[in-house]
Amino acid sequence: MALDRRGFLKFIGGATAGILATPVVWKGLDDVSIWSQNWSWIPRNIKGANSYVPTVSKLCPTGIGVRVRLVDGRPVRVIGNPEHPLSKGGVSSIAAAEVQMLYSPARMKRPLKRSPDGAYVMISWEEAEAMLLDGLKAAKGGDALACISGDDNGTINELLSAFVQQSGSKSFFLMPGEAQPAAKAWDLMGGEGQIGYDIEKSDFVLAIGANVLEAWGTAIRNRHAFGASHPHGAEPTAQFVYAGPVLNNTATGADDWLPIRPGTESAFALGLAHLLIKAGASSSAPDFDAFRSLAASFSPEKVAAQTGVDAKALTALAQALAKAKHPLVIVGSEFSQGAGAAPVMAGIALNMLLGSVNRDGGLRALPVARKVVPAGMDRKAMLQQDLTLWASAIASGKAKAPKAMLVYEANPVYALPQGSAFKDTLAKVPFKVAFTSFLDETAMQCDLVIPVSMGLERLDDVCTPYGCGEVVYSLATPVTAPLFDTKPAGDALIALGGKLGLDLGVASFEDMLKAKAAAHGADFDKLAEGTAFTSRATVGANLSFRPDVLSKALDVKAPALPLALAPVMKLNMGTSKTAIPPFNTKTIRRWEVQGKEGYVMLNGATARKLGLAQHDRVVLSNPTGKVTVRVNIFEGVMNDTVAMPLGFGHTAFDEFSKGKGENVMHLLAPSTEPVTGLAVWTGAGVNIAKA
């Protein structure tokens, strides 16, 4: 059934509302001072002049602009930048903690190498660079060198990919996210450039799966758009509807929440397409008739059976979409990764039927600036690479392992589905190097660890994060000199490339960013002053529905297990490359983790059916793995579904993350989406039993 905000609050009552609103710190720690947030390494009582420096957060995946408060030249606080288009004065919980993380004792302070006994020892930069040079000399030709980047949208990816390609390899990969399946869907349907979602100008936003107000795309900008359309004491100027398995932050904020089973986003979207076409929606696309035939098989009754949505609610939603002047449909993963191209294709098809392509308030085709590193990959080529399938092939022996691997600000051992299996991949690589600011799970498996200056200590950039409704290019400028013996990776790699005889085509990292600014038509000096470049330009969008691809890509079989698994991502709990910032421990809710034990969420009906009660210790298991957790009864979860938060279960990093809860990625295994060949892992199921 559909559940609006007022109805839900009446249903759950004040007690549950209090739980949702009250953050409680973890219990059971031996040293209570750890949780006081009065740590000795945090700057305080600094006397001196105040100043505010604009820059961009490289830690937060939303690409927001921030202002850093300095006292006597020392960074002490991050606040939102009201002048930045992706911030509008807002700031994410992870960006807000970025200054604190500068001073963390867990930061990498010197290069490390693994000794013969497996322990790490500190070495000089000279020794580290010599070791790196020797290791990479042996990795030339074929696919002998691989690189994984955790930077979603920086120009450094062109440099890293150039480094790989000049060595004779094609094995450059980005960490999985929403952009890769969207790029595949967009390409299959004939799109040019990058998909953009013009949320600010829409009067009806339907998010299917995509957690747009918390962890999907440009979440802080999305929140501002939502707030602007819902002024206090006045009628909303836009309606937000969320369809997904969990009452997450997007569902809580939205005007309506329609619970649907995990992994059924495509069927839900095609059910809406069927109703829109039945009501008269059409398209000039050459394959519209074939798409109409495909959509006709998704009647409200069939979609209700597949997704769990109420058929009448689906019909009412289709009618509301059709009446809107500027409707927008966004389809994505509930936890910002693991979805295939099929759900995105179904979402694009809905926007086509609604006449919302390349118009204000709709789906927009954004131009992508040309690459500026001649030997590097362009953005489209990067997004075609599938890290998960590549790593699985090596781990299983179906593909040859590279001789050397560079991992840049990424943590695949922790963050990939069945990520612990990535250890098997790394074990087959003779020489492994991590460029990182923290000793995370992946760095712990590497032979050499290079300490990278954090985003507030270096020059960097952000190119139109996925989800933007317009082109946005921003420059991250250093607000302080490196606090420890660290270096930005860009110039170090350029110098290393010269010693290896690689023709990277760039003289310095700053010159590379100046070229990227010029490629956007932006003024570098204004960017350096903190002014983001924006453009409302679009490129052509001569789209087709591609029902031939979509019909086959839908054929992903969910495992026949009692419960569907719904991972939940929240930025306060970190990202795929960052663990829980110490400041954010106070935002962890009581029944998300207690001491070292994590919690999962079931609704009351599902718990009663399984004979479970609040706080019961249970084992979730499937052929991929198993975890031991406790039960939290929460009515904001779909029937026969168990919701589990991301961000817990670290085995490395620092005392604030290590050993807290379980890693949901242990329960997720990739399968292959038919036709597209993409790795997908949004349709997992689990068994549940009392521990």
UniProtKB/Swiss-Prot annotation:
GO BP terms in the entry: anaerobic respiration
Cofactor note: There is no molybdenum or tungsten pterin cofactor present in the Qrc complex, despite the similarity of QrcB to molybdopterin-containing oxidoreductases.
Keyword Metal-binding: yes
Signal sequence range: 1-27
Gene3D superfamilies with a match to the protein in the record: 2.40.40.20, 3.40.50.740, ADC-like domains (2.20.25.90), Dimethylsulfoxide Reductase, domain 2 (3.40.228.10), Formate dehydrogenase/DMSO reductase (3.30.2070.10)
4Fe-4S Mo/W bis-MGD-type domain mapped to chain residues: 50-106
Post-translational modification: Predicted to be exported by the Tat system. The position of the signal peptide cleavage has not been experimentally proven.
Similarity remark: Belongs to the prokaryotic molybdopterin-containing oxidoreductase family.
Protein name listed in UniProt: Menaquinone reductase, molybdopterin-binding-like subunit
Species: Nitratidesulfovibrio vulgaris (strain ATCC 29579 / DSM 644 / CCUG 34227 / NCIMB 8303 / VKM B-1760 / Hildenborough) (Desulfovibrio vulgaris)
